[in-house]
């Protein structure tokens, strides 16, 4: 995807796909950097917002993860995963505070 980004750096989906690959490789901060670019190009990219939530969970930035999922849910209210993930993150926070 790097080559595609070089050819068209304004194509948000290329950045999003590379962010996904980086996430799967465990390169969470690099993935976050690409997600930031996606959202700079297309602030309503709900897939990138959901991905940002996953990255923030891995980085243990739980409040940021919840905010990402809330934004995704606001943009795409019928998408079920943000609601589920928000609930799971809140439960995780609760368990860690015990």
Language-model segments: residues:
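Register position in tetratricopeptide repeats
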Residues: 24, 58, 88-95
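Canonical positions in the second alpha-helix
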Residues: 4, 37-38, 71-72
């Amino acid at each position: 995807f790097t080559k595609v980004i070089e050819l068209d750096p304004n194509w948000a989906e290329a950045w999003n796909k590379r962010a996904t690959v980086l996430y799967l490789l465990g390169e969470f901060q690099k993935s976050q950097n690409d997600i930031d670019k996606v959202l700079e190009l297309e602030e309503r990219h709900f897939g990138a917002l959901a991905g940002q939530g996953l990255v923030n969970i891995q980085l243990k930035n739980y409040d940021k993860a919840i905010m990402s999922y809330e934004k995704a849910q606001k943009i795409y209210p019928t998408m079920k995963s943000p609601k589920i993930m928000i609930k799971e993150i809140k439960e995780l926070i609760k368990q860690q505070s015990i």
